[in-house]
Each structure stands twice: as C-alpha cells, then as structure tokens.
C-alpha cells in the first residue's frame, strides 16, 4: 500500500471513530456534569444555589398547602362527615383521573412531543448524525452528558466562540437553545444564533435523541435546570452573558429557566404560545373538551405566560405572521402569499405580549393602552405597523425620556432593597399615571414595538441569522 493510500485509509478510520464517539449509542458515554456538581463558591446569588429535587418539591407543596389555608405541619383531623365527602369526591373523580392519565401517557404525549417517538428518532437518525458531524467538524462542538436531579441523562452540544468573539463580541455571549416538540439540537433552532456568531449550548428534551426519560413538564424543567447549571458552573459564563432562546414549545423551558434564574441576561421567544389549552382544544374533538382541559392542566401545564411574567430582564418575542401552529384562528391562508387582514389575530403570541406588558406596565396598559396594542397586533406586515405607528404620532424620544425619568425618580425615592433586582428597578412600573389617554396610547405602542418583532415566516421555517437579535434594553 502506498503512503497516500495509507493516509486516506487512516483518515477514513479516524472519521468512523469520531462518528462512533458522538453517535446515538449514548449509554456508555461518561457523565460530564451532574446537577449537584457545583464547584463555584457560594455568594448568596440565586445562580449559586444548590436546591435538591426533594427540597424543591417540598417547597412547592408547602406553598401549595399554604395557599389553600392548610397547616403543613400539624393539620387537625377532619370530622367523619368531611372525610366521607372527601372519599366520595375522590371516587367520583377516579374514572376521569384514570382517563386523563391514560391519555397523557399515550396519545397525549405523542401529540405534544412527537419527537420522543421511537420511530421518528430512527427515521431521523441519519440526519441527526450528519448534524452532529457538522457541529463537531465545522464549529468544533463539544458533546457532553449531563445528569438531571431525576436521573435523566441529557444530551448537549456546546460551541465555544470566546477565543474568537468577533468584532461585536458576540462570542462572549452564550445562547442556550430550547428546541420545539419535534426539534433536536443537531438540526434545530441553534443554527441562527450559531451562524450569527454567538457561543451556543444546545440540548435535547428527555426522550429525544441521546437524552433519556420522557418529556413531561417536570422532567423538562429538571433538564433545563442542569443545563443552566452546566453553563454557569462548568462553562463559566457570567449569568449576565447568558441568553435563553426558546422556539415553539421550547418557550416553556426557556421561561422556566429565566423565572428560576432571574439573573440570566436576556430571553428570546420565537413562535411561542401563552398556554397550551387553547391550542389543544383546537385540534381535539369538541366532545373531549373536559378531558382535554383536565389532561393538559394535570400533565402538560405549560404555563408560559405565568412564568414569563416572573422574569425581570429584557424580553423579545418573535411572532411569525404565517404561523398556523400556535394560532387558534380559522382563516389561516394556505399559501404564504395569500395574506389577508386578520391572519395574525389568533396567534397566541399576542396574548403573551399583552400579559407581559400588563404585568410590567399596568398603568400604561389600562383600557386605552390595551386597546391600541390589540389593534397594533392585527398588523401582519411592516407597512401596516408603520402606518398605525404614524397614525398615533408616536414620539420615540419622548417615550424613552419618560421611561428613564420614571426610573431615575424611583432610584431617588425607593430605598427598599426588594424594589431592585438583578436588572435594576423591579416590575411592575407604574409609569403613565397622570398622563393623558393620547400619551398612554403612544407609550403602549412604543413598548409593544420594542418587545415584539414580526417575521414573515411559517412556524417551521428556519430563522435567518440576521433575524436573531437580543432584546431591547432601556
């Protein structure tokens, strides 16, 4: 054998070896990081805390019982009549509970998370392996196995740009990507921030690709928890330099992460909804309404809007104007070019924006503000947005000055430490009190335009790198 042929054969064998190293036989892969592997010294910051799963669950139930008015330590015994009524109620609810459980663990899980189906994973395996090869060869991706607090093994891929951050320093910022219900990091939403020059950390839901377990909300949250800890404590990114990007159903884990770790730098939600119930009722028979609502609330309670309002940092919502997946509208066009007025009215991202602005700026969003923002959300293209913006004569400079003046005034008047968070003055802001209705409309439109960006794209269209932007900061 000639020297050249030997070298070619050696390169071929080496490539086969590399492919085997990051193939989907992930069981024998050594554990790189566990949820309790926190080597950084404790500073009292929430990014440094190490709550066990048992302690976290206990805390949740303590709060739940307290909200119901019960004594969690010593609960007095109920009367015999009360116990009988409780038993009868449980017996009456047992059939519906069993039906809900059966639906959630069979058809329900496959509908909510189709990417966890074994047949889909097998069918996509060649594409997933090609995606892994591309990330490793072109972007020097580093694969790692993380273990969550429930024992699930989470498959991750990290692309580090810190050595060559680029002219804008984007590589110093880490984007944690949360995929959709049929998305994998090998061929998912991480391509946009990756091509835009950011450092990127992708991971697969439990039951997706190399990750073990089943993709129920609590398992997803546990997986997200270990991913964030891995980014902060092993990859050593400062919390302020970490951006969480969630696409579609990935908005649940993205908002959970920023709610649990409010010191994280920013949140970007792409084609995300506020609540799963309206979307589930859209695709299921009307006669199943009671069962569907109960199943979603008990087993797939993806309360994205509630979690979003708990995050005090910068937020950007990306709404796709041709999205028929997260829309409850009945007149979505069949062709992308057939845009008609009202196509975006049923997009659940509208409710997400309204909930966010109402929580953060309640005085601005009272009556006139909510009405004008709802009208602005009906605009399905840039021309309609601009026309409505000009109609109300929104003065961006005045809006910025008003918001900054309110913040500076609060800095002088408020001495309470609870009024300040990792991103400055905590929400809600009561700016807008005393302003005229016209000024409140202008301020509401200004805030809506800063928090939501329209994209003329369908739900599954890949996001262009130039469309991935960091949220607006005051």
UniProtKB/Swiss-Prot annotation:
The keyword Protein transport does not apply. Transmembrane segments: none annotated. The active site is at 248 (charge relay system), 323 (charge relay system), 423 (charge relay system). It is an enzyme of class 3 (hydrolase). It catalyses: a 1,2-diacyl-sn-glycero-3-phospho-L-serine + H2O = a 2-acyl-sn-glycero-3-phospho-L-serine + a fatty acid + H(+); a 1-acylglycerol + H2O = glycerol + a fatty acid + H(+); 1-(9Z-octadecenoyl)-glycerol + H2O = glycerol + (9Z)-octadecenoate + H(+). One of its GO terms (biological process) is lipid metabolic process. InterPro entries: AB_hydrolase_1, AB_hydrolase_fold. SUPFAM superfamilies: alpha/beta-Hydrolases (SSF53474). Keywords: Hydrolase, Lipid metabolism, Phospholipid metabolism. Pfam families: Abhydrolase_1. Its EC number is 3.1.1.111. Expressed in most tissues, with highest expression found in the testes, skeletal muscle, and brown adipose tissue. The keyword RNA-binding does not apply. Residues 175-295 form the AB hydrolase-1 domain. GO terms for cellular component: nucleoplasm. GO terms for molecular function: hydrolase activity. PANTHER family: ALPHA/BETA HYDROLASE DOMAIN-CONTAINING PROTEIN, PROTEIN ABHD16B. Belongs to the AB hydrolase superfamily. ABHD16 family. Hydrolyzes the sn-1 position of glycerophospholipids with high specificity towards phosphatidylserine (PS), PS-PLA1 enzyme. Also hydrolyzes the acyl chain of glycerolipids with a preference for the monoacylglycerol (MAG) 1-acylglycerol, MAG lipase. Plays a regulatory role in cellular lipid homeostasis by modulating genes involved in neutral lipid degradation and in phospholipid synthesis and composition. This is ABHD16B. The gene is Abhd16b.
